[in-house]
Amino acid sequence: MLMCRRWLVCSLRCHYRSFSFSAARRTVMPAWVIDKYGKNDVLRFTKNAALPIIHYPNEVVVKVHAAGLNPIDISMRGGYGAATMAMKRDPLNISQSGGEFPLILGRDVSGEIMECGLDVKYFKPGDQVWAAIPPWKQGSLAEFVVVSGNEVSHKPKSLRHDEAASIPYVAATAWSAIVNTGGLNKDNSAKKRVLILGGSGGVGTFAIQMVKAWGAHVTVTCSQNAERLVRDLGADDVVDYTAGPVEKQLKNLEKFDLILDSIGGETEKWALDLLKPWSGAKFVTLITPFLQNTDRLGLADGMMQSAVTVGCKVVKNLRKGVHYRWGFFAPSGSALDEVSEMVDAGKVRPVVEEVFSFAQVPEAFQKVEQGHARGKTVVSIMEDQKE
């Protein structure tokens, strides 16, 4: 009987704790939103954005302390991937066209858990966390955001929130491309040769540190003025793309086990020749036509066109003894758990180029849109809310 009563009391307390935030909170919050796709002038600040609520028992509400911006935010502002994102948000097409608006951008979040769904076991209100938010969900340029429990992870203890917000999206992207698609991990990377095309941006600066921490030899392409940065992060060889044709410079080096391409364009016409043939070597590109195809042709035809395109390239390169793959962002709290350990162990550090205030979100977008990044652009949100 005593055990039963303890279980009942515990259950009631857990139930109350999980939803205590809902009972007393407001129904609106400050946020930056867009009401249509376009250029920077579509960004609008509002104090009346709908405050997010838990819809599924595995979700958590996070109070945003800092948000990170990524090139995907610039693309999404202009409508890139709208067809695919709409399908992910509304698989049955119940909502009318434009049902995603007002849309909140921002893929990185670092903050504090305020509320947990009933199935969330590893987090509690008050936990300091970070997460990479999938593009089909409402983003982090707001006071609060809802994420799934399997997307969130405890923030590294050694980082401030504005530092932590620079890592999750690029870490999840690099992890998906290098580990899930490329096949490298901490146990098999020693002495492997890795080439990172475009090493000074967000994904590149993280990928350098991760594979270097795993014992790989890292070669990076970047401009001359980014060489010091990438060498400080662990790059062994640096190729300056402003000093002449990159492919000619790279052909003078030993061949590679893995190439991570964050540049796209003409690179895949010559980069696969830099791989070690018949050794399982892989070329993984993050620049794919998948979302462009679905936007242009519709979901079904776009997916078919993408399958044909990648299939032809896979077969063509298999004949040469190398593997061609597309890499994609994949949210993963478990991957961020491992990254958090690497950060606290001093093996990975944040690379923040500039921090903007919440009032400066349009300026932050302009900074990312200019390109030639030397790390990440971050928006500090919690400090503005205190004022």
UniProtKB/Swiss-Prot annotation:
EC number: 1.6.5.-
Transit peptide feature, positions: 1-27
Main enzyme class: oxidoreductase
Superkingdom field: Eukaryota
UniProt GO MF annotations: oxidoreductase activity
Primary location class: mitochondrion
Pathway this chain belongs to: Cofactor biosynthesis; ubiquinone biosynthesis
Gene3D superfamilies hit by this protein: Medium-chain alcohol dehydrogenases, catalytic domain (3.90.180.10), NAD(P)-binding Rossmann-like Domain (3.40.50.720)
Protein name, UniProt field: NAD(P)H oxidoreductase RTN4IP1, mitochondrial
Organism, scientific name: Danio rerio (Zebrafish)
Lineage per the UniProt record: Eukaryota, Metazoa, Chordata, Craniata, Vertebrata
